[in-house]
């Protein structure tokens, strides 16, 4: 172990980020990559597809989703992105814009408030707005 590093110093220098997990929930690696405007290639686990292709938003594609353990598909995605700097830049911008719109504290607070309000309503529990 040579000491701690600040990942922000390195992410922005990368052409792409690759997540080849076989299990994930909400991978922070993707959000960290988007903060640095870096596109992501990720396996189809957890919410990777939603983060990369979007969920009810118009930000555009921010990377590629590949099948788990499909080495040929992962390699193809890497070579496709490596060969097209303009596409990587657009995807990085799309990811950054998605992150800024959907993962700010204010947006997350609003989303959780709506979830709890709807749950309280479904249980016939009164809800006072915070």
Go through the PLM ranges and name each one:
Residues 53-71, 80-85:
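Conserved acidic donor-binding segment of nucleotide-sugar-dependent glycosyltransferases
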Residues 105-130:
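C-terminal alpha-helical cap of glycosyltransferases
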């Amino acid at each position: 172990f040579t000491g701690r590093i600040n990942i922000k110093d390195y992410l922005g220098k990368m052409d792409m980020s690759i997540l080849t997990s076989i299990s994930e929930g909400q991978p922070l690696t993707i959000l960290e990559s988007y903060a640095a405007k870096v596109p992501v290639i990720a396996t189809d686990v957890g919410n990777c597809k939603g983060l990369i292709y979007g969920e009810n938003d118009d930000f555009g594609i921010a990377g590629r989703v590949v099948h788990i353990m499909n080495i040929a598909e992962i390699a193809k995605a890497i070579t496709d992105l490596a060969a097209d700097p303009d596409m990587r830049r657009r995807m990085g911008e799309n990811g950054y814009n998605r992150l800024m719109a959907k993962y700010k504290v204010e947006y997350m607070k609003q989303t959780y408030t709506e979830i709890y309000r709807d749950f309280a309503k479904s249980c016939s529990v009164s809800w006072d707005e915070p």
